[in-house]
């Protein structure tokens, strides 16, 4: 745990008592603050009370007594409308911050030079975060990984010299971290997502850019320049005097890091050299994973990792569950769990990685549908549509891709397995990459992916992927 000493002797309101919120309560109390905990969920209030925290309805308390409101990232800060706790704090002139802001303040107080890598992007940030942490561990560093990827940041060990914190950050977390100052900041990409929480794509992109704009003096901003938002951000930061490393999987760069499906190449002033090989690494299959690997390599190099350690680390990376996860084979059919493909851009990366696809898609639809995936339709032998988006997706596929309305995963998996097995293709792929959120049928994408994995492993003759 990281004790938060910056509010010692002061009263702090914490709203949202899930994993990160409760961790904030413990960290603040350990640092000497008085914590008043609140949540709209009464069960979480009971849990906090059982942990001996003061709980109260913050609507009934005088806000001038609070030094800060620590807000969980899941609570609306601006859109579609600010949560009532945010309005109360603003009326009283109380700052509204999140757990990563508490971490940043503690790092500046106690270990300002401790390496801190922060990663964001619409897609790929979890894989990139896990890969960087893996590379740093392979290089012998004491590595702490958390944030949006799982472990609450304040539940990690405190910053100190020689200890690296590798932290995934969502746009919600960045919004709550006004003094974000990583030593290495990574912006992978920006495509339309979470517009319900940010209002416009421009505001969403501006929030993402703040992560790299905040890189501390002497640090490195690593920016994917394969979209216009990234290109503009890189140019702005360079003009502001930041050290910028551009990464691309679409074009060779005169200065920066370029990757394709086989190699990572670093260029400087026109001269280039190979940094690492990617061919044959199953956990990093696909051009989207080449981008993740390029960003991770750039971060590792910025932190002093040598080329041999980098190459060995890439080859030994096990990958992440629900992200292009190869869950089994039945004869020649490969089953791939990409449940984390919650929007069309993420699913495009999965579809581009295989040739003969029996595609399971659908769920709670997002803005834009799957029209942008048309270039990949020739790769799809048949689609199996589930959830709320089934009819919408069927209308898009009509006349272009054979499909059936499967409604549920329970129906889709055996149907896709049957059709793949009878197709006569040399390596058919049954791919779950929904291009949708999961909330119509599952609590989250992890539960959806686990359900897919369970259904696959229950099929006759399915074996683990060697």
UniProtKB/Swiss-Prot annotation:
<dbReference type="InterPro" id="IPR036565">
    <property type="entry name" value="Mur-like_cat_sf"/>
</dbReference>
<dbReference type="GO" id="GO:0005524">
    <property type="term" value="F:ATP binding"/>
</dbReference>
<dbReference type="Pfam" id="PF08245">
    <property type="entry name" value="Mur_ligase_M"/>
</dbReference>
<keyword id="KW-0573">Peptidoglycan synthesis</keyword>
<dbReference type="InterPro" id="IPR005762">
    <property type="entry name" value="MurD"/>
</dbReference>
<comment type="pathway">
    <text>Cell wall biogenesis; peptidoglycan biosynthesis.</text>
</comment>
<dbReference type="Pfam" id="PF02875">
    <property type="entry name" value="Mur_ligase_C"/>
</dbReference>
<dbReference type="GO" id="GO:0009252">
    <property type="term" value="P:peptidoglycan biosynthetic process"/>
</dbReference>
<keyword id="KW-0132">Cell division</keyword>
<dbReference type="InterPro" id="IPR036615">
    <property type="entry name" value="Mur_ligase_C_dom_sf"/>
</dbReference>
<keyword id="KW-0963">Cytoplasm</keyword>
<keyword id="KW-0961">Cell wall biogenesis/degradation</keyword>
<protein>
    <recommendedName>
        <fullName>UDP-N-acetylmuramoylalanine--D-glutamate ligase</fullName>
        <ecNumber>6.3.2.9</ecNumber>
    </recommendedName>
</protein>
<dbReference type="GO" id="GO:0004326">
    <property type="term" value="F:tetrahydrofolylpolyglutamate synthase activity"/>
</dbReference>
<comment type="similarity">
    <text>Belongs to the MurCDEF family.</text>
</comment>
<dbReference type="GO" id="GO:0071555">
    <property type="term" value="P:cell wall organization"/>
</dbReference>
<dbReference type="GO" id="GO:0008360">
    <property type="term" value="P:regulation of cell shape"/>
</dbReference>
<dbReference type="GO" id="GO:0005737">
    <property type="term" value="C:cytoplasm"/>
</dbReference>
<dbReference type="InterPro" id="IPR018109">
    <property type="entry name" value="Folylpolyglutamate_synth_CS"/>
</dbReference>
<dbReference type="GO" id="GO:0051301">
    <property type="term" value="P:cell division"/>
</dbReference>
<comment type="function">
    <text>Cell wall formation. Catalyzes the addition of glutamate to the nucleotide precursor UDP-N-acetylmuramoyl-L-alanine (UMA).</text>
</comment>
<feature type="binding site">
    <location>
        <begin position="121"/>
        <end position="127"/>
    </location>
    <ligand>
        <name>ATP</name>
    </ligand>
</feature>
<keyword id="KW-0547">Nucleotide-binding</keyword>
<keyword id="KW-0436">Ligase</keyword>
<keyword id="KW-0131">Cell cycle</keyword>
<dbReference type="InterPro" id="IPR013221">
    <property type="entry name" value="Mur_ligase_cen"/>
</dbReference>
<keyword id="KW-0067">ATP-binding</keyword>
<keyword id="KW-0133">Cell shape</keyword>
<dbReference type="GO" id="GO:0008764">
    <property type="term" value="F:UDP-N-acetylmuramoylalanine-D-glutamate ligase activity"/>
</dbReference>
<dbReference type="InterPro" id="IPR004101">
    <property type="entry name" value="Mur_ligase_C"/>
</dbReference>
């Amino acid at each position: 745990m990281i004790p938060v000493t910056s509010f010692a002797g002061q009263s702090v309101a914490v709203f949202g008592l899930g994993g990160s919120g409760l961790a904030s309560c413990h960290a603040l109390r350990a640092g000497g603050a008085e914590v008043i905990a609140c949540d709209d969920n009464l069960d979480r209030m009971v849990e906090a009370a059982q942990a001996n925290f003061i709980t109260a309805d913050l609507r009934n308390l005088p806000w001038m007594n609070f030094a800060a409101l620590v807000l969980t990232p899941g609570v609306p800060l601006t859109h579609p409308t600010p949560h009532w706790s945010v309005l109360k704090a603003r009326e009283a002139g109380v700052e509204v911050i999140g757990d990563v802001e508490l971490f940043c303040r503690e790092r500046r107080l106690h270990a300002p030079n401790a390496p801190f890598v922060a990663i964001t992007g619409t897609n790929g940030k979890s894989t990139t975060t896990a890969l960087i942490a893996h590379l740093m561990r392979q290089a012998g560093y004491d590595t702490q990984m958390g944030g949006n990827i799982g472990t609450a940041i304040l539940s990690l060990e405190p910053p100190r010299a020689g200890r690296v914190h590798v932290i995934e950050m969502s746009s919600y977390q960045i919004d709550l971290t006004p003094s974000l100052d990583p030593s290495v900041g990574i912006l992978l990409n920006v495509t339309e997502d979470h517009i319900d929480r940010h209002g416009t794509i421009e505001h969403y992109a501006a929030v993402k850019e703040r992560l790299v704009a905040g890189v501390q003096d002497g640090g490195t901003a690593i920016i994917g320049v394969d979209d216009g938002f990234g290109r503009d951000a890189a140019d702005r930061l360079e003009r502001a005097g930041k050290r910028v490393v551009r990464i691309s999987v679409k074009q060779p760069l005169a200065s920066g890091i370029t990757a394709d499906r086989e190699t990572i190449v670093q260029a400087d002033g026109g001269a280039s050299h190979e940094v690492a090989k990617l061919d044959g690494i199953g956990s990093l299959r696909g051009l989207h994973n080449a981008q993740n690997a390029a960003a991770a390599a750039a971060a590792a190099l910025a932190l002093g990792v040598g080329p041999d350690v980098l190459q060995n680390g890439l080859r030994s990376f096990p990958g992440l569950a629900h992200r292009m996860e190869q869950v089994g084979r039945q004869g020649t059919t490969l089953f791939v769990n990409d449940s984390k493909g919650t929007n069309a851009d993420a699913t495009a990366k999965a579809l581009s990685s295989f040739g003969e696809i029996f595609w399971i898609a659908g769920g709670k639809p997002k803005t834009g549908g799957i029209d942008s995936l048309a270039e990949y339709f020739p790769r799809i032998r048949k689609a199996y549509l589930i959830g709320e988006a089934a009819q919408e997706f069927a209308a898009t596929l009509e006349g272009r891709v054979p499909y059936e309305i499967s409604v549920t995963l329970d129906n889709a998996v055996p149907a896709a397995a049957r059709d793949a097995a009878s197709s006569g293709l040399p390596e058919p792929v049954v791919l779950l990459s929904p291009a949708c959120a999961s909330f119509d049928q599952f609590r989250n994408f992890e539960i959806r992916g686990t359900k897919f994995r369970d259904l696959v492993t229950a099929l006759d003759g399915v074996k683990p992927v060697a």
